[in-house]
């Protein structure tokens, strides 16, 4: 009976975590060939954002400069110049194909994220019973922990999310979200989000600690306050 009681919340957690990913991954694989064919055969202007334009232009200029430098050093005849034009043409085709693949992956990532969001939304609306079971299991698990372990876990979570060393992690996470949804990365917006999101989370954590925990477990708040290396 105890094993069955522990298995049900674990099954609910597994379904919430892996079900959206499995469905979106299957959808992505099934649409990949169709989107690739559609993107490579459609007759429309290629859209490049500023970052992509600079990246492709930089690669092309570097490639061209290398061949021109080679020509200046070797001073080969016209046949060598003809080979140079052919190589530049091949490199241009390669850059276009690479750019197309980047756009295809952006479209697929965007569709995958939308599908995951829709699945989680439906799950939160229709899966009330599973969420109630999971919530009760989490509360029971936390209740059985000692106050010292709870205080240590809270402090570790706060330092991990809003500590002075968490800036790099926030930049990486926000940049990944930008790339997944196909947005143009903006250093000013990313810097603003990196500075404001940890402050918001820090405020929420402290409000939760001194509002909720002070009522539920005063001893836990005392242990947290007694830790000398907290901010």
From Swiss-Prot:
One GO CC term, this protein: chloroplast inner membrane
Keyword Oxidoreductase: no
Top-rank taxon: Eukaryota
Keywords, sorted A to Z: Antiport, Chloroplast, Hydrogen ion transport, Ion transport, Membrane, Plastid, Plastid inner membrane, Potassium, Potassium transport, Transmembrane, Transmembrane helix, Transport
GO annotation (BP), single: potassium ion transport
Catalyzed reactions per annotation: K(+)(in) + H(+)(out) = K(+)(out) + H(+)(in)
Any matching Pfam family: CemA
GO molecular function: antiporter activity; proton transmembrane transporter activity
Membrane topology qualifier: Multi-pass membrane protein
Residues passing through the membrane, by range: 7-27, 104-124, 154-174, 189-209
Disulfide bonds: none
Compartments where found: Plastid, Chloroplast inner membrane
The protein's role, per its UniProt record: Contributes to K(+)/H(+) antiport activity by supporting proton efflux to control proton extrusion and homeostasis in chloroplasts in a light-dependent manner to modulate photosynthesis. Prevents excessive induction of non-photochemical quenching (NPQ) under continuous-light conditions. Indirectly promotes efficient inorganic carbon uptake into chloroplasts.
Record-linked HAMAP family: CemA_PxcA
Entry similarity comment: Belongs to the CemA family.
Protein name: Potassium/proton antiporter CemA
Origin species: Pisum sativum (Garden pea)
């Amino acid at each position: 009976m105890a094993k069955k009681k522990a298995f049900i919340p674990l099954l609910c957690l597994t379904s919430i975590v892996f079900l959206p990913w499995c469905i979106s991954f299957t959808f992505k694989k099934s649409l990949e060939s169709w989107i690739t064919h559609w993107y490579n055969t459609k007759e429309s202007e290629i859209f490049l954002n500023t970052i992509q334009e600079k990246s492709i232009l930089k690669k092309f200029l570097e490639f061209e400069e290398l061949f021109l430098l080679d020509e200046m050093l070797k001073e080969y005849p016209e046949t060598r110049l003809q080979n140079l034009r052919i190589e530049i043409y091949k490199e241009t085709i390669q850059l276009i194909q690479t750019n197309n693949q980047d756009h295809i992956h952006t479209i697929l990532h965007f569709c995958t994220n939308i599908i995951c969001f829709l699945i989680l939304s439906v799950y939160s609306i229709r899966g009330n019973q599973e969420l109630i079971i999971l919530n009760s299991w989490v509360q029971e698990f936390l209740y059985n922990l000692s106050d010292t372990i709870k205080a240590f876990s809270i402090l570790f979570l706060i330092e991990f999310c809003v500590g002075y060393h968490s800036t790099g992690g926030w930049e990486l996470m926000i940049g990944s979200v930008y790339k997944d949804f196909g947005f143009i990365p903006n250093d000013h917006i990313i810097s603003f989000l990196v500075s404001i999101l940890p402050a918001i989370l820090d405020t929420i954590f402290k409000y939760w600690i001194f509002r909720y925990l002070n009522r539920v477990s005063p001893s836990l708040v005392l242990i947290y306050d007694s830790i000398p290396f907290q901010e």
